[in-house]
Amino acid sequence: MSISPTQPKILKAGILPMVCLAAGLVFAAPAQAEWANLRGPNMDGAIEGVGMTAPWPDSGLERVWAKRLGTGFASTTVVGDHLYTAGFSDDEDHVYCLNVKTGEQVWQFSYPETIFDRSHEGGPASTPASDGEHVYILSRTGKFICIDAQTGEEQWRHHVVDDWGSEVPRWGYSGSPLIVDDKVLVDAGLTVAMDKKTGEVIWKSKNYGSAYNTPMVETIHGQKVVITFNGTGLTLLDYADGAELAVYPWPTNYSVNSCTPILHDNHIFFSSSYGQGGAMVKVNDDFSLDAVWETKEFNNHFNASVLHDVYLYGYHGHYGRSENALRCFDFETGEVMWEEPSISRGSVLLIDGHVVALSGNGELVLIEPNPEEFTAVSRFQALGGKCWTESAVADGMIFVRNNEAGNLFAYRLTGQG
């Protein structure tokens, strides 16, 4: 384990500017799962029990608070009353703990880092993960840090390059940590499982090349399996020891396999851009993988799709090119059902059974989950600038962010009308 040569800065509440737009006004919302990892409770972008108002008011959802974080692409996680996220400014990465109800800063943990702005704005792309006791973050250059969730004090750290021999990918590390049981996992080309309290390495997998993806842990055929999507392709590992169970090669330009796969009924969908496309494979009892279909017609570039019934809703096409658009796609057959070009280059969630898309230009859209045709139930301009970060939901609110300015907005989903 390596220790930081420099003392990180920890700032308590009130250091950065914050605007509370509805001070003291908190609506009661039904109990719902916490958003402790990237893409929510089950890492599938879906959450129930929010009590979301639908349709939304004509004027849009109520904005509760706003916070400037600095440049970056990190999303948010929420455990209890604490929200965790990250940004970059003044040659440092900053991990923030905010009060989820008000946006008030609880603490800020800062450490030296490069902006890593190759072909984009840069800043942290990894989303912090938390179990309420610890917060974990992976920086663009490979610093993997455990922070006390209550105090903001560093507990331990590794460096995935110096300690484990990983190589920084072309656009820097962007996968997020995953907490499962007493372990924390990170994919840095090789997947590493550590004791979440001490940082002791429990196992390391072989190295599969560039890593931009967040690992998943799922039970398949009665066995706990780690699913990763790395430079080699779709990879299944034994959760107990990291041993390889299966690999489905998926060569993508620049090895950018970044979107979280989707598991449904022992079938896995995965997708990448640069013209590579998407595929669905069946996981057999012996963990061999059989291709069900492959297609060039559904290219998820950065952000994964959501599954409603047997239909996927997500973004097709390279985020830097004009062809990107929201599509509905048949999970079972690989058929494109519809396309909506007015919504592009963003992220998508499934909230109380409704599709909610944030476009790359900051428009928030409530969509009827209908494979027959695109139907926007409500839409409004939630924020400006480039919005490539995945949204998150907790405490009856949706959290949306833009990238260069790093403004995080909280919008009330419940009690609207």
Label for each model-derived stretch:
Residues 14-26, 191:
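Bacterial N-terminal signal peptides
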Residues 40-43, 88-90, 140, 189, ...:
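Short loop/turn segments immediately following the C-termini of beta-strands
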